[in-house]
Amino acid sequence: MHDPRPLAEKAAALLKARGERIAIAESSAGGLISAALLGVPGASAYFTGGGIIYTPRALKTLLGVAREDLKDMRSSSEPYAAFLAETVRAKHRVEWGLSETGAAGPTGNPYGDPPGHTCFAVAGPVNLARTLRTGSADRIATMWAFAEASLALLVSALEQRS
């Protein structure tokens, strides 16, 4: 099983040291990214909020984005992940946004991506986006892998800013 705590602790330390804050928009990680960051003592100093953007209704309700606002962009893509990260960052008026969007399994998504596929992005002073394919249909293991990879990307962005 993956353990994102060391990455969450590193991200928290970097955010707190600079007095910066983050908001999260995650999908198939199911709240594990937020939970890892909130599990670090003192999270209120750097974590402002976010949501699990699992459906078009959640996208509209939590971020104020309608499907027609996305034009030709599809979920589970790096451009969509970057859009979500920037949107959640701007909505919360914070320095950093982190997003994740994928297919945890045991089946793929409606866009043809296999289980274990996700895209994730960081928006802020450093912008990064990546794709991960775990090759696994194990839903729980994949969700943890998505959270860990997303936090690793966040740490990378924070370290690039240093």
Where are these regions (language model features)?
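Short alpha-helical segments enriched in small residues
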Residues: 1-162
